[in-house]
Amino acid sequence: MKSLLDEMQQCKSIKDCIELALVDAYGDDEQATAWLTCIEEMFGRFDRVKVLGQEVALEGFDLADGVAVIAVCRQGKRRARVALESVEFPDLTPIEARWLKAWKQFSRGLG
């Protein structure tokens, strides 16, 4: 049986990514949780990202208001929950870039 990450890496288009993310996800809560799971799988390898041009530690991902995937970041003693759209991931692979575009498209209501 394929792992979720293996299946995610087989997606050839943004539409494929969105369809895979939302398989068996009904309602806003389930869709948000499904996206959170996919984002954690695809971007869990990153421990450093940029927010507003500053390098910060990426501690993980979470949901805001139950519907938006956010990044949990830390710089020194300060911790922030940041919209995923505001996070710059270094050296994205083409599939990672595709999944990030898919999330952005879906989160803007275009998916």
Predicted regions and their residues:
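Mixed-charge, Lys/Arg-rich low-complexity intrinsically disordered regions
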Residues: M1-F46
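Long, low-complexity intrinsically disordered regions
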Residues: S3-L4, A21, A97-G111
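Short coil-to-beta-strand transition motifs
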Residues: D47-A57
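Glycine-centered tight beta-turn/hairpin loop motif at sheet-sheet or coil-to-beta transitions
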Residues: V51-G53, Q75-R79
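Residue-level recognition of beta-strand microenvironments
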Residues: E59-F61
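Short aromatic-glycine-enriched beta-strand elements
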Residues: D65-V72
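A short macromolecule-binding patch
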Residues: R78-E88
